[in-house]
């Protein structure tokens, strides 16, 4: 079987890791696997045998945002046509909402077996801060993408949220929980690392408003806990700077350690006294499974 993953880059998030875990298993099963990344960013090692290509957008025109989706769909179409000279794709898995918006406009994939993979709770991510007409418009935009299409979600709650909050009906709606290679996970937890000695708390996740690092820092400041708080992750520089400034304002900057993205966070997780999770919502809390299975 020939399988294509499409994703908006591999910058080090949970969904990206899931995609590569699935790709590796398909390859072990003897399938031919391709991955098209829509950004030239990759923080993870790629599985051996993966056909990986980047279809990055080089447009720098002032009006590029107005034409982004249709332009990028054409770029994706060209890449798919080239790739299918070696055989048609039997299964196409689109991951992350921005990717889905582009794949939904693809002409080359219109007659393919396309599944849209949802990794998060959309109402929390896209409706939580919206009201009135703005909220209704966002609901309609999301509905247009997924209505009548094949959708797979990482938990039942993600699927229910999509149907109930956006009043849409997929052609097929399936739940497939995120995969974990438990044997490899436990081996990785034993690897050498630069984790600190002694007790510490840990949070693993990209710097994004939905992860609510602000709430985490405020709660940590109020807790009176002396053990340091280790933050593993990265994001936009301005977001990290805001968090660093908040730590200073709360007078905890000497106890909050920003350690960046770690390709293997498992030794850090295993060595922590406590794992903390502060997100507004999680489609599937990968790090919780990793924490429980790494000990």
Q: What name fits each language-model region?
A:
Residues 261, 280:
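Aromatic "clamp/platform" in nucleotide-sugar-dependent glycosyltransferases that forms part
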Residues 16-21, 199, 203-222, 241-242, ...:
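A conserved mid-protein helix/loop that constitutes part of the nucleotide-sugar donor-binding site
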Residues 5-12, 17-19, 25-67, 158, ...:
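N-terminal strand-loop element at the rim of the active site
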Residues 94-100, 118:
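Short His-centered aromatic/hydrophobic patch
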Residues 147-173, 180-182:
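A short, active-site helix/loop in glycosyltransferases that binds the activated sugar's phosphate group
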